[in-house]
A protein has these predicted regions:
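Short hydrophobic/Thr-rich beta-strand motif most characteristic of the beta2 strand and flanking loop
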Residues: 31-38, 46
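Charged docking surfaces used in two-component/phosphorelay signaling
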Residues: 21-29
Length: 131
């Protein structure tokens, strides 16, 4: 699928390959171009090298650079500050969701989640990207 017919470009970063595959499959089925990263450093590099990212999905706890730190960085860069971010985590600490929202995330999804829950949250995220 070419960028001309896609609904947008979404950066997805998670150190769990199964989660990456699931999120990518759902987003591609919805017509998005998906850029994946296996850790925070890869996500940071993708942000620097990719153009036209319309939304991002980050795991809270990733090697090298945690999700909230990536979001804080995005909020300091003019070209990234309006990109909506969804955070996900399997950790049960409620502080992580507070930290994610404080960093600037707009959607938070605890793992494990159902495909329907993920689709609902992704639609919310993409709705933010369009507004």
């Amino acid at each position: 699928m070419s960028d001309n017919t896609s609904k947008g470009r979404i950066l997805v970063a998670d150190d769990d390959p199964a989660i990456l595959r699931l999120v990518r499959a759902i987003l591609e089925k919805e017509g998005f171009v998906v850029i994946t990263a296996r850790d925070g450093k890869e996500a940071y590099k993708a942000l620097q090298e990719s153009t036209g990212i319309t939304a991002a999905v980050f795991d809270v706890v990733m090697p090298h650079i945690p999700g909230p730190e990536l979001v804080r960085y995005m909020k300091t860069e003019k070209r990234f500050m309006n990109i909506p971010v969804m955070m996900m985590t399997a950790e049960q600490d409620p502080k992580l969701s507070r930290d994610s929202f404080a960093a600037g995330a707009v959607v938070f999804l605890p793992k494990p989640f159902t495909t329907a829950q993920l689709q609902t949250m992704l639609r919310m995220l993409v709705g933010r990207a369009k507004s």
